[in-house]
Amino acid sequence: MPIGNLGNNVNGNHLIPPAPPLPSQTDGAARGGTGHLISSTGALGSRSLFSPLRNSMADSVDSRDIPGLPTNPSRLAAATSETCLLGGFEVLHDKGPLDILNTQIGPSAFRVEVQADGTHAAIGEKNGLEVSVTLSPQEWSSLQSIDTEGKNRFVFTGGRGGSGHPMVTVASDIAEARTKILAKLDPDNHGGRQPKDVDTRSVGVGSASGIDDGVVSETHTSTTNSSVRSDPKFWVSVGAIAAGLAGLAATGIAQALALTPEPDDPTTTDPDQAANAAESATKDQLTQEAFKNPENQKVNIDANGNAIPSGELKDDIVEQIAQQAKEAGEVARQQAVESNAQAQQRYEDQHARRQEELQLSSGIGYGLSSALIVAGGIGAGVTTALHRRNQPAEQTTTTTTHTVVQQQTGGNTPAQGGTDATRAEDASLNRRDSQGSVASTHWSDSSSEVVNPYAEVGGARNSLSAHQPEEHIYDEVAADPGYSVIQNFSGSGPVTGRLIGTPGQGIQSTYALLANSGGLRLGMGGLTSGGESAVSSVNAAPTPGPVRFV
């Protein structure tokens, strides 16, 4: 795609031809400029020093903005950065899975697990939280290439790569390696703490050197007893108690509102009183009615022969009234008796019904609720007692080991007849001790966490000695049978530790490895005070005297 003219060119109407690409291993025209006739030739046609480290996640973002142009140079890295001397590879800032994981967890260890769909996920941990990313096939292949033992545990080693890129190496337990090395160097102590008065380094004639090694171990143990509230049986018991209390309350409310009320005392009437009252009332009523009819009265005849009512009822009328009044009294008596019986029956029926309801509600409500309360209380008590007797202790022990090395080296005079054969050894050991002094090892009885041994190393990035692999040196020393006995001297003589063995074995084989790998050179702590190289010193005849390893 042509680029328009943005300047005040007289040929402003013409288009500027596209710029030639800077090809990498993949031709620039094939990446985005399909159909371009521009070939990758010319002065900028060769970029052999740079090649893509891997398929970057950012390659698909803007590589097709301008067809024919090369990949962004930030996505190109030196081919030699893929594998370094530490047996790892470099992680670019390409927003890929490993770059994202390193951003999240920093310089720490992570593991690789196979997911259900067949993909591989890198899982790290930070502040007790797991961070998981899905690896690309290229990253998984790179991790497999350095993980020869198939541990699937790796570690970010900080910005030790080019341009501050982090490195990925296979994780190893540095505490276990240190214990094995100390057990080899000091069999009597079995890898324990080394006494301060033992100097395992040789001091040459004509030099005054005092070395004091101190190992300070700090152990912090925190024990947390799990609470009984974490036991689900305890909460079941508490729930039973709460349900029982709720049942008691519901039963009381139901008995107060929903049950048959307590009946009142039955109202009774005296039958005799009722009969007398009815007889008297009936007699009065019939007498009044009888007086209304004059024929019912007796008649008196005066002197003139006239019939005059006497105001008295006839005898037969009086007898009828008395008979009817008596019958009315008997009826009233019978009604009073029946009324009393019905009232008593109603009272008894209501009282019996209430008693049945009370017994039923009390048996179900109060009985069940009380049973729940008792069962919950017993369950809570038993659970608490068993928890106190068999409570699991969540114990976490963290041990931090710091090694502090202090060295004071006096004058080194070749004219005094001595060759300081341990100057390189001191320099190498000091370098390793200084790295070990800031590397902390944490372990726990409930965790298999492997802490990165290179995460906090503050060595110079461009220092050649800081980039030398040291694990194989420790393994050589620990596995060498000649480097197994330490002789201690006491008295007025200098404190030196001499290693029993033959020249070329033990620590001298370590010197040879360092010399062959470029670790010992002139001006960096050679084996001789002169200009001989480390190789010539190793191959030369042993120097008689206390400097020699006999």
UniProtKB/Swiss-Prot annotation:
Residues 1-233, 384-550 are cytoplasmic. Phosphorylated on Tyr-474 by host kinases. Tyr-454 can also be phosphorylated, although at lower efficiency. Phosphorylation is stimulated by clustering of Tir by intimin. Changing N452A: Lack of pedestal formation. It is a multi-pass membrane protein. The keyword Transcription regulation does not apply. The intracellular N-terminal region interacts with host alpha-actinin and is not required for pedestal formation. The central extracellular region (amino acids 277-332) is involved in bacterial intimin binding. The intracellular C-terminal region binds to host NCK. This is Translocated intimin receptor Tir.
